[in-house]
Amino acid sequence: MGKDEGIPVRVALRCRPLVPKENNEGCKMCLTFVPGEQQVIVGTEKSFTYDYVFDPSAEQEEVYNSAVAPLIKGLFKGYNATVLAYGQTGSGKTYSMGGAYTHNQENEPTVGVIPRTVIALFREIHQRPEWEFNLKVSYLEIYNEEILDLLYAARDKTNTISIREDPKEGIKICGLTERDVKTALDTLSCLEQGNSSRTVASTAMNSQSSRSHAIFTISIEQRKEGDKNNSFRSKLHLVDLAGSERQKKTKAEGDRLKEGISINRGLLCLGNVISALGDESKKGGFVPYRDSKLTRLLQDSLGGNSHTLMIACVSPADSNMEETLNTLRYADRARKIKNKPIVNTDPQAAELQRLKLQVQELQVLLLQAHGGTLPVLNSMEPSENLQSLMERNKNLEKENGKLSRELGEAAVQTAQFLEKIIMTEQQNEKLGSKMEELKQHAACKVNLQRLVETLEDQELKDNVEVIQNLQQVIVQLQDESSGIAGSIEAMDEEAASFPVPEEDSGEKRSSDGFTTNHALRQAQLSKELIELNKALVMKEALAKKMAQNDRQLEPIQSEYLNNIKHLESEVGVLQKEKEELILALHSAKKDNNQAKLSERRRKRLQELEGQMTELKKKLGEQSKLLKLRESTEKTVAKMNQEIQGMKMQRVQLMRQMKEDAEKFRTWKQQKTKEVIQLKEKDRKRQYELLKLERDFQKQANVLRRKTEEAASANKRLKEALQRQKEAMEKRKDSQSKGMEGAASRVKNWLANEVEVLVSTEEAQRHLNDLLEDRKILAQDIAQLKQKTDAGERIPTKIRRRTYTVAELENLEEEASVTKQIESLETEMELRSAQIADLQQKLLDADGEEEMVKRRWETISNIMEAKCALKYLITELVSSKVAGSKLESSVKQNRAHVADLQKNIFEERNQMAEMETEHQSQLMQLEQHHQEKILYLLSQLQQKQASVPVTIEELPAEEITEREKQLMERLKFQDEEIEKMKALCEKNQQLLQENDMYKQKLALLHVASGKKLHNILPAAEICSPDSPFDFIPPKPRGKRRTNAKSAAVILEDLLSESESEEESDDKNWEPGNNSKQSKKLTSKCSCKARCGNKMCGCRKTKQNCSDDCFCDPSKCRNRDNHMDEGKHEDQSLESENSKIDYPDVTAGGSFFTPPCVTPTKKVLREISDIGQVLSIKLQRKPSTASASASVMESQENQTSILTKKKKVLCNSNTSFFSGCSAITEDE
């Protein structure tokens, strides 16, 4: 038994709670559930309504009892059923369906739909002992568009499975394993076996993600024990679909990516099928079931023979809002699908039942055909028989038509007469009732004759006589009405006795069906009306007679009542007398003398009993008469009700006859009008025929004038062509004008649409960035909370935003862990609010599906479509040109940056080579210089030791030769110094060029907004020939050190502002000595030991001199204290000379190889010795004290130089030792 109307697919929405991962990422709920309503709201405005809605607090049992349990009862009635779960990956489909069931979960509340369905199915089977059941189960999965048997023993072997379509049984799967099951335990073991074989893998969104679609099918065959023909077949499909996923969220690669593509392809085909079935405009159109194996297997479940329930599983997290919205729309379209389930009976039993019905129908037809034979006239030949029958048929049709018309007219007349009769009867009834009222009036009961005799006033006598005359008139009218009623009754009896002729069934056919039917119907209604009138008259007469009898019984009834009372009193008296006689008889039995008296009393008693019996009989008869009257009254009341009903029925019949007559009149008028129109058409055709004949006669004349008309026709043709050309030009002008207006309108519309779509995409990109930022914030908060719980001290984390150094220092000093967590949570709430606002705007921009569908309805004709296409092509070409320009400019910029970088590398390499060469030259010069100084010192000591005389005592030749030698040496030293200055200046120029290139590179980085590694390949950034690691500069708020290139300037080396305690200056940098040269004239006046920076000389990094006002014996900033602090100075030099330079690695810096460079103090002392010697040569001392002081100073300087030489020789550090790379904070 099929159902005429389709049953919609039911949809249940289930929302899972937020998982810990989503909580850790700071996700918020984006779904709102309306209490008491099956409705869910996405964001703030967009709402969806489904058959069932389950919020995150709903348990498995509630979902099953509300949505799935009603389908189980239909299975035992022969209907198929399907339950399928759809949703995003990780939304709870497998959990809801029980796709991961094991025997350990048997009694747990988390058991899904499939195990609960199996248990309920077998529970229902046990409650039907009069039926025999045969159950089979199968379990398959669709993995990468291949059907795999999950119950097949050896899944490694190829098991050929194909899909076939049976027109009677629907979709069948050939080669699939089906197992017979007897109990729920057997079925659940098959389910567990299939679950263990199902393909499952881990993704970034779900650790146990189903990678295939799974279908668990239970086939049920039920047959009644006593009736083999009463059997049903049904199937239950339990479908666990794989979740839709996005690669950027699942991070799928390799096989997982291929699986995800296959899953999305199958779900896309399923969505196309749902859209085709749910779209009312495409109803009856093509449905792409064959695009996927999943849709072919679900062909009966979607739009076919099945009761279907779809469980849409969604995630409430706002990070998955787009997927959730797609799922809700998907489910909303599924609600529009109409299935047509039918009862699946046994084919043999159904065929047998169909044949039985067919036999019954044939038997009825056979009876209607009078045994299946028609009368045939055997006395005539077949041709004569047919001809006579045709003639007879025509005659009968004519006669039938005539009789039908007459019958119709008679019926109309009868209806009119009956209507008049009814009205007359109504008036008669009214008059009769008034006559009865007058008759019952008190004036009619007065004896007027006696009253006339007694009255004396003549006027009163006249009035009484008038009243007496009126009484006589009333009596006469009553007699006349009774006579008319009697004659009417006699006429009715005669009409009833008149025989009604039987109708010939063979002559009922008429030529005009509608007229005949109308006449017959009017005749039938008239007949019914006449019969109704007869019955009504009879009943009215009977009711009147019964009423008269009742009125006649009224005095008898009163008399009977009085008699009954009298008899009852007599019976009472006799009863008392009887009781007294009985008592007297009992007393007489005791006395023998009163025998005669007792005998008389006994006789009297018998007489009394006889009288009492007669009185009781009379009393009973009179009671029966009273009951008879009561029953007569009830009968009269009932008859009156029937009379009223018959009158109403008569009125309805009259009304119906009037309506039929009016319809027939309207139809007849219409037909008459049509006949008139046809006659008019026929007349016109006759006229046209005559006209054509006249035209034909005129053709000869037309042929004669043919030559003359050729020229005029040619002229008219030219004129027509000219007019046509002008019309075409006008039409083109109007079209061009219209096209321009349409073009501007379409252009503006398309520009607006493109702007909206671009804004939507940008908003989506910003939304993804905000979600990622919130995820990072949630991770930071979780880490801080974990460390807080563990009791660790958390260092202040520097966020990715840019702070100044002072702000960072204040933040490190003042911020605490609690404040950090609170600030992060506030920032995360701000991100969540921005996310919700963006999502709502995206929802508003997206709009309903109908708005998306109506997007192109603005283009209504081909002209607008051409305008739109032209505009889109123009925009596409312009965008392509702009893109190519940008690409070419980017390529040029990259090439330019590469050239600049290459030049920088070359310059750096060249600078490094020059630096190494310069260092080597400096070292060689220093060695030569030291050798010369040592040679001079040795010569000076030897001379002093060998010749203990003064200079004045030396011969002039010797002094001259020595002076010449010293002058030559001084000249040589000056030349070397000039060379060193030139080299230093060249080095300084190279350093300035290097700084300029660095600034250019930094500007390029800021302009491009990209890192160097994104612009140039790695091979260009790090050249194998480069002896150092280049770190690209980044914009910084403030640097700890102003690291400059290590340039050695000769003026600084030779300045006299350096002291032996220069290692104490922690802020010393190369090239800063020019600032210190301004402080040479400072003097101190300390009263202590000059041991701290309160001393002016120590503060300016100078030794105290003789000009200072401090105590020489206590001062520790003089030369005599330097030997004591030698080792301390070395350690201070090695520690405090480290500044924030880039880290120096072996083979990776231009600061290699290490070299020993003299300090400024040594060079200064060397220059002092040269100055002393030059003074000696230029000026000869005049006194011995002067020569003694000079010799003493020479000895002191010699001892100091010897000490410094030992320090330099023992030191393993270079001038640039301790330099480290400047680490740039991210």
Swiss-Prot record:
Comp. bias regions, Basic and acidic residues: 722-735
Subcellular location as annotated: Nucleus; Chromosome; Cytoplasm, Cytoskeleton
Cofactor stoichiometry and binding remark: Binds 1 [4Fe-4S] cluster. In the presence of oxygen, the [4Fe-4S] cluster may be converted to [2Fe-2S].
Keywords: ATP-binding, Chromosome, Coiled coil, Cytoplasm, Cytoskeleton, DNA-binding, Iron, Iron-sulfur, Metal-binding, Microtubule, Motor protein, Nucleotide-binding, Nucleus
Residues that hold ATP according to the record: G87, Q88, T89, G90, S91, G92, K93, T94
Protein origin, superkingdom: Eukaryota
Region (Disordered): 494-516, 722-741, 1052-1078
SUPFAM superfamilies, A to Z: P-loop containing nucleoside triphosphate hydrolases
Tissue-specific expression: Expressed in oocytes, eggs, testes and brain.
Record-linked SMART domains: CXC, KISc
Biased composition (Acidic residues): 494-505, 1053-1064
Entry coiled-coil feature ranges: 351-1006
GO cellular component assignments: chromosome; cytoplasm; microtubule; microtubule associated complex; nucleus
Domain Kinesin motor: residue ranges: 8-337
GO molecular function per UniProt: ATP binding; DNA binding; iron-sulfur cluster binding; metal ion binding; microtubule binding; microtubule motor activity
GO terms classed as biological process: microtubule-based movement; mitotic spindle organization; spindle elongation
Residue numbers spanned by region Globular: 1007-1226
Cofactor: [2Fe-2S] cluster; [4Fe-4S] cluster
InterPro entries per record: Kinesin-like_fam, Kinesin_motor_CS, Kinesin_motor_dom, Kinesin_motor_dom_sf, P-loop_NTPase, Tesmin/TSO1-like_CXC
Function in brief: Iron-sulfur (Fe-S) cluster binding motor protein that has a role in chromosome segregation during mitosis. Required for mitotic chromosomal positioning and bipolar spindle stabilization.
Record-stated family: Belongs to the TRAFAC class myosin-kinesin ATPase superfamily. Kinesin family. Chromokinesin subfamily.
Entry protein name: Chromosome-associated kinesin KIF4
Species this protein is from: Xenopus laevis (African clawed frog)
Gene field: kif4
